[in-house]
């Protein structure tokens, strides 16, 4: 089994030009798993040429801003394209409220 880890962001509070907020992607035999989704996650995915459409699960450790502020943008992008498989989000109970509020405020169709 081949497992690769990509640190997409490791900063806190405020993203810097070369250091985005918390996010790690694991790739295992073509499957992609995202752990946290801080601001700048989409930029890092693009810079590393990682196929964000292949992310099958997003795990959210907790709902501090530096771990979730990239989620609305990634979900909005995901809602605009055809996905081969569903996207699952696993996290603490309040993550559902955060996603629903973001969906409503940003008028997302997810």
Model feature map: region roles:
Residues 1-110:
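Binuclear metal-dependent hydrolase catalytic cores
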């Amino acid at each position: 089994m081949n497992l690769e880890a990509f640190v997409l962001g490791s900063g806190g509070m405020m993203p810097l030009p070369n250091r985005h907020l918390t996010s790690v992607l694991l790739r295992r035999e073509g499957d992609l798993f995202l752990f946290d989704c801080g601001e700048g996650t989409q930029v890092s995915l693009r810079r590393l040429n990682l196929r964000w459409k292949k992310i099958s699960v997003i795990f959210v450790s907790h709902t501090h801003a530096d771990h979730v502020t990239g989620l609305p943008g990634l979900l909005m992008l995901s809602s605009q394209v055809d996905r081969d498989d569903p996207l699952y989000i696993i996290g603490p109970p309040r993550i559902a409220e955060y996603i629903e509020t973001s969906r409503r405020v940003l008028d997302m169709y997810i």
